[in-house]
Amino acid sequence: MNKVIQGNLLKYAAAFLLLQTLIITLAPAVRARTLAVDYRWSQWVALLLWIVVTYRVHLSIAQYLPDADPYLFPAAALLSGWGLLTIWRLDSGFGARQALWLGVSAFAFIGGLQLPTTLNFLRKYKYILLSGGLSLTGLTLLFGTNPIGYGPRLWLGCCGVYFQPSEPLKLLLVAYLAAYLAERIPMGMHAFTLIYPTIILSGIAILLLIFQRDLGTASIFIALYMIVIYLATGRRRTIIISLVLLAVVGIIGYYIIDIVHARIEAWLNPWNDPSGGAYQIVQSLLAIANGGIEGRGPGLGSPALVPVAISDFIFAAVAEETGLLGTIAMIATFGLVVVRGMRAALRAPDLFRRLFAAGITTYLGIQTLLIIGGNLRLLPLTGVTLPFLSYGGSSLLTSFLALLFLLLITNHLDEEPAPLPKPQPYLVLATCLILGLFTAALANGWWAVIRGTDLLTRTDNPRRIIEDRYVKRGMLLDRNDTPITSTSGTIGTFVRIYNYPDLAPVTGYNNPVYGQSGLEASLDDYLRGMKGNPTSTIWWSHLLYGMSPHGLDVRLSLDLTLQQRADEMMLGHSGAVILLNAQSGEILVMSSHPTFNPNYLNEIGSQLNKDPDKPLINRAVQGLYPTGTVIEPFAQALLGKTELTENERKSVYEAFGFNSTPQLQVQTAAPISATPHAADLHVSPLQVALASAALSDHGVAPAPRLAISVNTPTVGWVVLPTPGISFQAVQASQANEAAQAFTANGGGYWSHIGRASGDESQVTWFLAGTLANWQATPLVVVVTLEEDNGRLAQYIGQELLTGAMRP
């Protein structure tokens, strides 16, 4: 019966891995959305080897251990195959090495199946085995190396083959403790007399690891030691002592060992240094967030962006490509190993095998929680490996040896379970391990679902850059559908093109090095296709391609013909120009100078950041200038005079909205005051333009609009909501009278030149707008020059306004 159950479970595991291998093969075609690609075939070698090895082990278990637990090996086989394919997909060279180690582990496993199920040799030679393990670990202090050439020297190596003695030392420690305690407990010895010899040997092992700077493994040793003692004695104080010791080790490591200090800092404050010391954990969380619920698909994610993805961060790699569903299945598989392992302990025929089975289960459970918790920022990074999955021959071999001993213990045939007067410690341990795995699953859901959107929109998320090369980004169009910003190239080589670069301070940029700004940032959800597309389209695109759907085009209110004219006249001058539909709030011109060419941002980006002229700032909405005499038309409308007291000046500011920040689809600056005096208020040209609109539209200041519609695939062009709201600044009669008062020589529009003194230079304002009796679209223009040049400001404003009035 056990053989049938084990065989059926292995078939399910094989089907899952077969599907994963097939998807990895087709991934290049899916990503490129064409069949003319180079497919991935090499991972089929890994799958074939896994099938052969697994089938052979299955037959051997059925032959030598017919009564063994039928769930343990299928769980381990699934995890090892999953890890092998993940490693091979990330790096075929390391994948081939892992496949070789899988073969070696299986060979050792099959050979070990013929060991006596009593495991008396472990009891008999406990001191020799532990001493041998300690000696090998001690040799790393003299002859230790690191396969990558730097970092802690925890391996012994020769001829390109490396072995980490501290991995099997965990098993040897558990075997020693189980054998020693099983031998001494029946003697009824005093607690201290019972355990003090174990303290010496276990302490030597822990000190060796501390000298090696391997605090992750040292922490496991402390936890293993205390838990086995707790199981043997039932005294809860051992757990308290264990927690205290772990805290002490952590504190010592924090202040003495650089790498431990860095890891704890990265754990506590990862967002303070996301590109430095916390780079690993931040990229791990980004990978988990990128996986979402269903994952990007095997071969379709970007887990290689996470450092050491084949080993320390293999959980994050799996999470990105199989999502929350995949990681929950993985965590559940580890949970199955824990449950069946503790069942083996409770049903063991003698105390030694009971303690040994519980210790092995604890070792697998704690190491699993450490690595998964580190990937999820539940715990600091430790550098230990995920059993059965992570790259590493020593770890894989040790995991299979642990599995072997569990199977030997469960194959007790007709032997009755040994008496267990106090089962509570075992039940408490099992509950804690399962709760730990459950907490990890909840944390996984937190980062993948709850925080996923926030993480993926971070500018330091390199996956956005990769996606931009494969998914066409939507265009920014002017009101006549002339492209302002577009995307060229083919899938895999898409590049953002700025067709009208002078608008760069407004449209911003979408750059792999410098991130996003302007409309490219604020409209990113539409341009990336994550908003405006049906939910089913987004979900299907993620499921099938592992990416967003095609981006959507956004139509702006700008008129490129008028915009070009404004930019030509502003050439060589610093300042801003805004031409506004006074009724609807639609911005027809938004010019900011000096400007830059975002097509060459990679070459000039570093210079732009240092440029004293600040070309990156959109002066029309982010530039703040002193008001000076610019408020005279508004004072005339509200109070009927232009000579104001300080309180009257404040009332004008309040009435026309100078004290509030305009709401627009780009980042706008809030007004500021350099001193408590009202005359020192600094406002943006956009604020002045909105106030001016009230004089041309019966006292109503409109809500500004820049992005007016988006082209959706289902209903076509859809009008975008207006971010702000309009308000009545003054009565219509007051506004009309003020406009007439500022109309010169019976012209068709009102106008005013204002001046103010800035921090570094004079500022010139020019305001103009149509009158109330204008039969067409009411318009206003605002020109701001960072120089004392009223004639130029008037010329620019009049040219734009009259050109718009008589197109």
Where is each model-derived feature located?
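Loop-to-helix entry and N-terminal half of a specific, functionally important transmembrane alpha helix
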Residues: 344-383, 389
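Hydrophobic, glycine- and aromatic-enriched re-entrant/interface helices and adjoining loop segments
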Residues: 138, 147-162, 230, 238-330, ...
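Beta-lactam-recognizing serine transpeptidase/beta-lactamase-like catalytic domain environment
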Residues: 541, 583-789
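Hydrophobic alpha-helical segments of polytopic membrane proteins
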Residues: 192-210, 215-255
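Hydrophobic alpha-helical transmembrane segments
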Residues: 46-54, 103-104, 320-339, 629, ...
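Membrane-helix boundary/helix-loop-helix interface segments in multi-pass membrane proteins
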Residues: 2-213, 372-387, 391, 395-396, ...
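Membrane-interfacial entry segments at the cytosolic side of transmembrane helices
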Residues: 121-127, 191-196, 233-244, 418-431
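Periplasmic/cell-envelope proteins involved in peptidoglycan metabolism and beta-lactam response
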Residues: 124, 410-615, 619-624, 634, ...
